[in-house]
Structures are given as C-alpha cells and as structure tokens.
Amino acid sequence: MFKAARNLILLLLIFIFNNSYSQLGESQKPSWTQTLDYKFVPSITDQIKDGTFIPADPDAYKKLGREKRWHGNKVVPGKGLPNGDDPLLYLQENTITKSSRDPILIFETTANTATPSDPTGEIGRDYYFASWNSSFRFFNLDGTPASPASSLNTLFGNDQSGDPIALYDSQVDRYIITSMGASGLNFAISQGNNPILDGWHVYSASSFGTNGQFPDYPKYSIWSDGYYCTTNTSDNNLYVLERDKIINGDSTASIQGFDAPQMITSGFASAQVLDITNDDHPSPGNATMIYMQDDAWNQVPTDHLKIWTINIDWDDSNNSSISTPYSLDTSSFTSVFDGGGFANLTQSSGPDIDAMQAIVMNQAQFRKFPTHNSAVLNFVVDALSGNDELAAVRWYELRQDTDGEPWVVFQEGTYTAPDGRHAFGASMAMDVQGNIGMGYSSMSSSENISLRYTGRYANDPIGEMTLEENLIGQSNATNPSVRYADYAHLSVDPSNDKTFWFVSEYFNPGRRDLVGTFQIAANYANDIGVVSVDSPLSGLLSNEETVTVSIFNYGEDTVSNFDVSFQLDSGNIITETYSGTVASTEIVQHTFSTTADLSVVGTNYEICAYTSLSSDEDASNDNFCSEIQHLNPNDLGVTEVSSPVSGTNLSSTELVTIEVTNFGGAEQSNFEVSYEVNGTTVTETVPGPLAGNSTLDYIFSQSLDLSAFGTYEITASVYLENDS
C-alpha cells in the first residue's frame, strides 16, 4: 500500500544587506560612577492625608507604551544551527508527567493598563507588591487590595516613563519599585517593612545616567553587595547601586556603570544578573550576569551562554570590574522569530504578537543549597524547523560548587505546551527543596492567550518539566496589539519558601494582569500515587502481558508496605503489596505477578492503576490510567517531507528528507520509499530496521534540482507488502 505526504516548496528572492559591527572589547573597569540624588517621600497613607497622593491614571487603558528600541538588525538569514527541530524537543514530548496541584489563589492586579502592561510583582512576608506600566498597588496575602492603585509619579515625580520592576529584598524585609526616566532610571525602597505606612527612600533619575540613551527595558536583581540593573542600550548597559547605603536611606549612596565586554546582540538585548531568590545570600562579590548568544546572529560562531563576573569596591571604584566573559556550551537553539521582528505568533484574529525573543526572561534566579549553588533562567526559542513555527521555552539550571566558582550547565530543556500551543513569556525559580516552578503564556492560532504553569521535582530526570500543565487564566478575547506583556514575573513566598507567585498579562476582555499562586513541594507528610503505566505499551501484544507501574512519593515522609492495584478495562481488580520503602520525591517501579490479556489485534485497552495508603492525605493523585493498543503488525506511512523547505539560494543538489512512521507493531526492514516532483519519481530502499510504533528520518541519496525560481510540489510515499 502507498501512503504519501506532500510538501510545497516555494523559492523566494530576498536581498540581504551587510552591516558593520564594532570589534569585541576587553574586561573593563566602571565607565561611569556618581553619587545618586536622594529624596525622602512620605508614605502612601501620609500622602493621602495631606492631598499629595497621585492615583493611577484612570485612562491608562487608552495609551500605548514606548516602542521597543532596536539597535540595528544583526540577524543573518540562514545562519546557525539547528538545521532541524530543536534537539531537546522530543525529550520533553516523551516525558512521563505527574499530576500538578491546582492553583491556590488567583486574582487580578489591574484592569486599567496601557499596551503592553509590563506585568511585575513580588511576594513579601506581609503583602504582594504589584506594578504595571506607570502604576503600583499592594495586596493582602488573600489577594484583596491593601492600598489604592498609585501612580509611580507619587514616588518619582514627573520624570518617569514606566517599565517598572517590583522587588522584595527578603533579607531586610523591604519593598522596592523602579522605573525608567527620560534618560536615566528611578529607584525607590520602603523605609520599613510596612510599605503603606512607611515612607520611601527615592534615588532619582537625574543622576542615574545611560550616556544620553533612553534606558530601555531595565531589569533588576538583588545581590549581596548591590542592586544590579541591565538595560537594552548599545553601551553603558550594566549598573550597580550601593545596596547597604540605600537600605538605610543614605544620601551618599553611589552608582557604578559598566560596558559589558564582548556582548553580541541581535539588535535588541536583555541580559540578566542573577537575583537571590530568598534571604540566604552568598558572600559579597562575584555577581553573575548571563546572556544567550545565538549563532544566527552576526559574529556568533556557535550557540552558547555567556557569563560575566562583576566585583564592586564601593570605597574605590578603580578596584571594581566586569570580567571578560566565558562561555558555556549548550544544545543548539533558534531564538530568532521572523528575522528578528516583533510580530511573531499568530492569533485566531488580530495581529501576530511579540514572542519576546533575544531576552533572558525576568528573572534569572539564584539559590544556595548545602552542597552547591544553583541558578535557573529561560528564553523563548522556535522549536520547529523550516517555515513551521512553535514558540517553546529553553530553560537551564546552572550549578557552581561554592560561591565565586565557575558555573556549569547541570541541565537544559526545551518546554513545549500540549496540543501544539506556543509556550513563551516564561518566568521561573526554585523552591527550598530544589523543585523548579515555571509560569508562562500559551496560545495558538485557534486558542486565545492563557496563563499556565508547570514544573519539576528536584529528583526528576534532568532536562524535563515533569508536572502536568495547569491553568491560571484563559483569555476570552484576542490581543488587539502586536505588543504583548513585554515580560512576566515569578517569585517565591518567603513565609514557606515553597509557594510560587506568577503574574502576567491576559485579556478578559480588555488587557489585564493576573496573578496565580501554586506549589510543587509537599504540604503533606503522607501522599503517594501511581504516575505511569510503564508496561505493556502499544505494540504486538499477548494474552500474558506483564504490568509494571511507577509510584511517586509526593509527601515529606518515607512510606512503605502499602497496596498497589491495577484494573484492565472493567475486569477484576488486582491488588498486591509494595513492601519496599519510598523516600520523599522518590519514584519506584512495581511489577505485578498477575499478567494481563491484551491479545486481540486492533483493540484499544485501558489499564488503570492506583495506590492505597491508609494515611494518604491527598487521594486526588493516587491513580493513573493508560490507553494501550494492540497494533496491526504491518502499517507504514510517510508523515512528513522535512527537507528541502522554501527559501533562497536553493541549489541543484538539494537533499530530500522524509519522516517514515511505523504505525504497526512489527519491526520493518528493506521497504521502498519514493518521492515524485513534476512527473519524475525516485525510488530507493530503506534498509531499516524500523521498530514498531516508532519513526525514522530517511535522506534520499539522489538529490533534487531546485535551482530555478518557481513552485515545486514534492509527494513522498512508502510501499510495504501486506500493509494493513
């Protein structure tokens, strides 16, 4: 039987212009130092009493934020790896997922925001501090408002232009808000731990210079010896503020500015300095700045992460420095969408929206553990090759042995959302146990923007987000603008060091910011459940199939001697005792002594398995069901023509690559495949073997001439005798 797949190849003529670029620099001392301008601003409560309080702009929703600053497109069309799909894509797609807990709390911070909303917020011990565009507001821990929505002008005066970042300095129990100025940056910290009743120490934009450039896209981090800020500027793109003095409202607090050497960009850039997640600080110095480097950009030979180390001497700035960077090799990635432009992801209606490319997303987070330090970060990538486009989240955990030691890549992954939806606009952090939580935006051409989350336990297989996706909020309208969010923000609750608070933008029906809180770490002492049926799997099956399941300990205590059961369709329930011990967050397998009959060809079976622990405190995650098919033995098909793809400079010797899928259960070898173009057919033999229920890519030895401009249709097929 012949089964065919078609691919339409369109040859395009595109003119490529060369750009000139400066030479790479060296490690540097500060390029700029200055004492910050200081003022004290009364509390929100006092401002309301004396009539000086400035509320949030009631007409903010009518306004459009500043355009993103583009410093020349430095993307080289056709340059860089991977040549195919993201190399980590299939690891995530084949992940065995565990159930995730439902959101704990969901609430909106604003329904009155300009475009985009610039959502940011951090959870403190007593309040959630939210900000957007040019406003901010404090919320009680139950999501109810604790203060009126306030204009940033009530702290900074008229010289502020939005792009706020809200921070909480857990070590000193203070709340921080920042914003852009006309040619500088604003910074304010609460005088005490009650940001509504306490006043504010404000450091003004007039002395926070960016060398005359607009301080686009500022991103802040807390480190032991300073508050660090990166900006999307062509030079003077890193700043450090004197944390110890700022905490005390010292008018002599200073700032040091740097040019990060050897930072190559696509024309828009946002590096991140590591932000300390909790109040366990490393020793002062050796702050780390990270930026991705895509080999699709000019002057970047391979995909990698670039690492800078910053050391500050507040007594003598001549001793301060930013290092020459070192590189961490990564799996290849494509961070470029639409040649570097901002209109990327297709909605069901309205304009394509910004995927937020070339950005290490807010924030890159640091956490100390007894045996090592960890850092987590992410950025958006295009996970599919050719003209197909799928936004996914490339994420990393870096580790160092002790403070100040070199970083290494401990794990990396590419997270894709289910159902072919985009995943982008992510923010992530680690909890006290080393579990990773990640919030993100998702959408497709048929589904509106939603806010969701996933994560992984510390002991899970590396490179995988193992928790089932969960929903925070679903938009009921599309985005009327190309601009979307610009960034998102996830923080960890300091009260338990476990609960994640995520905020981003959605539409209900207008533009709004939505907070969702969720937790991965256990709140229960005893909580176990089946997370997968490991065998049998779909294929050629018998009347005596061995049943093996995986059991996960969600709880904090070690458990043993509990019952585990399975049921085939509506048949008898088989129950056995697992006599081993399972530690917290450990996964174990159990193989039943009783087999299952799955012998009827073409039948879909369901096996459901579950645990029974008398002291289990959460029964919602006890069971898992799996559908298993007894496959026909012989069933092959071509499922994709993956190359060549439409583009420029196609040659007379283009290789033709197809994907062949074995839908059957029997291994296949020495079968024929063909491709046909304009009446000419090429047939070759695939030696195999191709295992049942699997795929392979086959590259034809006879190439294809696509050197003439035009449109070509490629039809590919496979022939297998006795194909069912």
Regions of interest found by a model, annotated:
Residues M1-E26, C608:
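Bacterial Sec-dependent N-terminal signal peptides
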Residues K3, Q28-T33, P42-K63, D142-T144, ...:
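Polar/charged alpha-helical tracts
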Residues L13, N112, G157, Y168, ...:
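Sterically constrained small-residue positions within well-ordered secondary structures
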Residues L8, L12, N19, S234, ...:
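Short secondary-structure junctions and interdomain/linker hinges
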Residues N523-S724:
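Extracellular/luminal regions of secreted and cell-surface proteins that mediate adhesion/ECM remodeling
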Residues Q23-N523:
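C-terminal PAP-associated
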Residues N18, A391, I449, K498, ...:
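Residue-level signal for beta-strand positions within conserved beta-sheet cores that form or flank
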Residues A5, I9, N211-G212, V531:
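Intrinsically disordered, low-complexity Ser/Thr/Pro-rich tracts
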